Design a protein with these regions (language model features):
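Hydrophobic h-region of N-terminal signal peptides that target proteins for export
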Residues: 10-19
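Axial heme c-ligation environment in periplasmic c-type cytochrome domains
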Residues: 57, 73-82, 86-115, 191-192, ...
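Electrostatic cytochrome c docking/interface patches
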Residues: 18-36, 125-157, 197, 235, ...
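Periplasmic/extracellular electron-transfer cofactor-ligation site
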Residues: 28, 34-61, 97, 124-128, ...
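Sec-dependent signal peptide recognition
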Residues: 2-9
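Primarily the internal scaffold of c-type cytochrome electron-transfer domains
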Residues: 58-64, 68-70, 113, 133, ...
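Solvent-exposed, polar/charged alpha-helical surfaces in well-ordered, non-transmembrane soluble domains
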Residues: 31-35, 39-42, 64, 85, ...
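Contiguous, function-dense segments enriched for cysteine-driven chemistry
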Residues: 74, 108-117, 121, 141-153, ...
Length: 261
């Protein structure tokens, strides 16, 4: 097994030199990342980064195919590649309620190295460069107040969030059973907003990012333009925070006392 692991590392590193697909020219960092990848990632994502590792074949939820250049968890606009920091955050923190574990035992340099190596699987990364994150609208002082929560409930209803997530946020809306597979071919299930952990991350800023940029490759749309004036929806920038705190109330109260018909 040790010899097999060493062979995988050699193949991966060799692939970097032959392909010449180092987005930043830091071959030492990419080479280091390839070793981290071979030890921690290849089992699911595969030697070629296509999500066809042997463990992925045994899982209900397929691993991310890096060769497609489609990433759910980003701070960048829809359709754009994630930033280095986005990749690093996902690698280190993992994705709750999925087979993607956290890698808290990795050193920071190892996490950043494997993030650079992941980028070599999608050549367009070198040409397109790094997109700019969507600006974070400051949280209003009244966010989470009774008036804010009521407004958030109205926004939830206006945007028809209940069609997928359900009025109580339990992921049982009328469209839930009819969503098509995502771009990886995985079945889609709307997030149960009452569960303890969101896949996008534990902070309110993570929820903000998911709502504003969407989850590429899935039916979860981006709402950034809707909340960005000028527009004719009647929504304002601060309404994204009203919606977020309504979602957090659904989570906190299990959806029962904050139903959004």
């Amino acid at each position: 097994m040790k010899h097999l692991s060493s062979l995988v590392v050699l193949l991966l590193v060799g692939g970097v030199w032959s392909a010449g697909a180092d987005p930043k020219g830091d071959r030492k960092l990419v080479a280091k990342g390839s070793k981290v990848y071979a030890k921690n990632c290849v089992q699911c994502h595969g030697p070629g980064g296509d999500g066809k590792g042997f463990e992925s074949m045994l899982q209900k939820l397929g691993a991310r195919d890096f060769t497609q250049g489609v990433f759910k968890y980003r701070s960048t606009p829809p359709g754009e590649l994630p930033t280095d920091e986005d990749l690093y955050r996902t690698i280190m923190e993992g994705v709750p309620r999925t087979p993607m574990p956290h890698h808290a035992l990795l050193k920071k340099k190892e996490g950043r190295a494997v993030a650079q190596y992941v980028k070599t699987f999608f050549p367009a990364w070198k040409a397109e460069g790094e997109a700019q994150p969507v600006p974070l609208v400051p949280r209003p002082k009244n966010a989470g107040t009774p008036a804010s929560l009521e407004r958030g409930r109205e926004v939830y209803r206006f945007l028809q969030c209940a069609s997928c997530h359900g009025g109580t946020g339990r992921g049982d809306g009328p469209r839930a059973a009819t969503l098509p597979p995502d771009t990886l071919g995985n079945a889609q299930y709307p997030t149960d907003l009452t569960l303890e952990k969101f896949k996008s991350g534990p902070e309110v800023e993570d929820l903000y990012r998911a709502l504003m940029t969407g989850l590429d490759g899935t039916s979860m749309s981006a709402y950034g333009q809707i909340f960005t004036p000028p527009g004719d929806t009647g929504l304002q920038e601060r309404d994204i925070w009203n919606l977020i705190f309504h979602v957090l109330r659904l989570k906190r109260e299990g959806g029962f006392s904050a139903a959004s018909p």
